[in-house]
């Protein structure tokens, strides 16, 4: 299991600049543009409903704009697909100008793809003499098809991502805990970079007027702040501020977890802040971050890569709560208590797309993470008498999957319809 856990962390904890769904669209568009011959006359983008939901209203770093069109146009303009999820970092003024010209031509068409896949991106570019198509499925960088002028350049048939996702079924909380506790520090110290990178964005979020300013307003000084200047509120503020900045288009990289920057924020910053508060060593922090990230990944396996439920508020915050519990001296039993408490608290938090108000969900999740860790370390847990919580923590986690599959079948459709109707009425 050691090698699987290390492989998973290195695959699932990776840097990205901006929200991952529009970046994945930019990545696909960039690949297609690199193959197309001639001047682009038409751009057709086919997306799963979950991708539309998460790309529709989120800020695109360095553009002052939001949404799918500018992200795709930038990918076409930049044509540096080798950068993958950092493709939107350090683009030039000329590249931005060209992207805006593409948007202004009104040649970008966006359509919903009728697919069972939560994450599906298809970008088709046409010129007078050429056509290029790229498909991404299942994970944000899993390119499954590249086609140019009816020639198949690459056809991966989505096998790679599915194989690794299947391995996540082997993850058990007890095994994750033991790995985090016993792994060689040299093998896991790379995970410290996730906290360093994300805390830099948090610092920027606390300084600037990003989004709703959820983080900065929690710790502002003045007559109208109802929050006290205590440790928990500082942790909540730091976490929310990173999301404030990221969702408002801050041009700084974020370390993602399981395909989401907000999940990366939610499972790293509260743990790092708690570690500093408790004066823990780098090794202790690394072990807590390994636990937090792997718990997040495990829960996300049952939620789905994109979900009607909030991955940051549920999976990421639960991971953080486990990491905090570990730093407080908790053992496996306390970790199990912590997970039961968190799922009791936050299991109904919906995902209504990627946008500035994600910072509110991060704040809520972080507050719950602290509260549930505090209960767990004192030996207090939700029990099988309480709602969807089971006697065994593995069953509690699996209940989230049952909830989504059986109870939330139409939630994504309903949310997306509300969002699209609102956009149509606001034109």
UniProtKB/Swiss-Prot annotation:
Any one Gene Ontology BP term: L-cysteine catabolic process to pyruvate
Source organism superkingdom: Bacteria
Annotated InterPro entries: Ser_deHydtase-like_asu, UPF0597
UniProt GO molecular function: L-cysteine desulfhydrase activity
Family: Belongs to the UPF0597 family.
Family matches, as PANTHER family: UPF0597 PROTEIN YHAM
The name this protein goes by in its record: UPF0597 protein CPR_0790
């Amino acid at each position: 299991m050691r090698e699987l856990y290390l492989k998973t962390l290195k695959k699932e904890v990776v840097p990205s600049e901006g929200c991952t769904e529009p970046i994945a669209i930019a990545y696909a568009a960039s690949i297609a543009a690199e193959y197309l011959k001639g001047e682009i006359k038409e751009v057709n983008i086919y997306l799963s409903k979950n991708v539309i939901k998460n790309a529709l209203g989120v800020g695109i770093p360095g553009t002052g704009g939001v949404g799918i069109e500018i992200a795709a146009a930038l990918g076409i303009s930049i044509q540096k697909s080798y950068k993958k999820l950092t493709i939107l970092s350090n683009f030039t003024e000329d590249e931005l100008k060209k992207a805006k010209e593409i948007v202004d031509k009104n040649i970008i068409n966006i359509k919903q793809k009728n697919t069972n896949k939560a994450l599906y991106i298809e970008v088709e570019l046409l010129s007078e003499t050429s056509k290029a198509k790229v498909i991404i499925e299942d994970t944000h960088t899993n390119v499954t098809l590249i086609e140019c002028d009816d020639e198949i350049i690459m056809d991966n048939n989505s096998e790679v991502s599915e194989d690794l996702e299947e391995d996540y079924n082997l993850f058990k909380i007890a095994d994750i805990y033991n790995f985090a506790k016993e792994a060689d520090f040299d093998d896991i110290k790379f995970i410290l970079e996730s906290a360093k990178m994300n805390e830099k964005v948090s610092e920027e979020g606390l300084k600037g007027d990003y989004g709703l300013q959820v983080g900065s307003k929690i710790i502002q000084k003045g007559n109208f702040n109802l929050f006290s200047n205590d440790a928990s509120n500082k942790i909540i503020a730091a976490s929310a501020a990173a999301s404030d900045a990221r969702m408002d288009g801050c041009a700084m990289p974020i370390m993602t977890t399981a395909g989401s920057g907000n999940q990366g924020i939610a499972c790293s910053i509260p743990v790092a802040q708690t570690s500093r508060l408790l004066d823990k060593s780098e090794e202790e922090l690394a072990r807590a971050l390994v636990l937090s990230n792997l718990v997040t990944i495990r829960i996300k396996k049952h939620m789905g890569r994109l979900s009607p439920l909030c991955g940051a508020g549920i999976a990421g915050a639960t991971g953080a709560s486990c990491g905090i519990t570990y730093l407080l001296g908790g053992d496996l039993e306390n970790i199990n208590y912590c997970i039961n408490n968190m799922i009791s608290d936050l299991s109904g938090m919906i995902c209504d797309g990627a946008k500035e108000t994600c910072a509110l969900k991060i704040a809520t999740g972080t507050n719950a993470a602290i509260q549930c860790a505090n209960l767990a370390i004192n030996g207090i847990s939700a029990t099988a008498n309480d709602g969807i919580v089971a006697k065994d923590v593995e069953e509690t986690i699996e209940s989230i999957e049952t909830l989504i599959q059986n109870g939330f079948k139409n939630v994504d459709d309903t949310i997306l319809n509300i969002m699209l109707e609102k956009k149509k009425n606001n034109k």
